[in-house]
A protein has these predicted regions:
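Generic hydrophobic, helix-prone segments enriched in Leu/Val/Ile
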Residues: 32, 69, 170-174
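Aromatic/basic-lined ligand-recognition segments
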Residues: 107-174
């Protein structure tokens, strides 16, 4: 249900997803901001190096894409983790349908970049969609050692912990 619409944004109440607080309940809100110019700035070499799902296209996307639409959920932190994961994945799929000429999706909470076609054509179901699109597994070489580190980023919207694995003397491409 659309509860606000103007030149700057549109807001939708997700009536099937009710956030409960100690002083009341209300539907989670899904917000879509207006289309703005995109300049591809603010993404340093480190952020881009961790965009594993779009390595071949990321530089072209940042160079050629001229517009962006920002979308977010509000009040969804009050939902159980699995419900929020499914809501956010459903929202992503709705945005992919709503913007058929969209070329890519960027997830600020985890730093992942996907071609829009990958979002539109996936066969993943349920909350696994959130893991696929909203959680990034990053790889680091620890300077001055032969150690490596793998960590995750993106579970915080669900209030779940990140994972971190530290490897000693292991070939990363086994």
């Amino acid at each position: 249900e659309c509860f606000c619409y103007d030149k700057k944004m549109a807001g939708f109440a997700a009536q099937e997803h009710i956030a409960e607080f100690k002083d009341g309940k209300c539907p989670v809100q899904l917000m879509v901001m207006k289309c703005d110019k995109f300049k591809g700035k603010g993404f340093d070499a480190f952020l881009m190096s961790q965009m594993w799902d779009c390595q071949e296209d990321r530089e072209r996307i940042f160079r050629e894409c001229k517009y962006q639409v920002v979308a977010t959920d509000m009040l969804a932190a009050a939902l159980p983790a699995l419900e929020r994961a499914n809501l956010d994945a459903d929202f992503l799929e709705a945005l992919a349908e709503l913007y058929p000429t969209c070329e890519a999706f960027y997830f600020q909470s985890c730093g992942k970049l996907f071609l829009a076609e990958d979002v539109r054509s996936h066969q993943i179901e349920g909350s696994d969609r959130f893991i696929r699109f909203g959680v990034n597994v990053r790889f680091f070489n620890i300077e001055g050692t032969e150690d490596m580190l793998i960590d995750t980023v993106g579970m915080s919207p669900l209030f779940l912990p990140a994972l971190q694995y530290h490897f000693h003397n292991m070939a990363p491409n086994w």
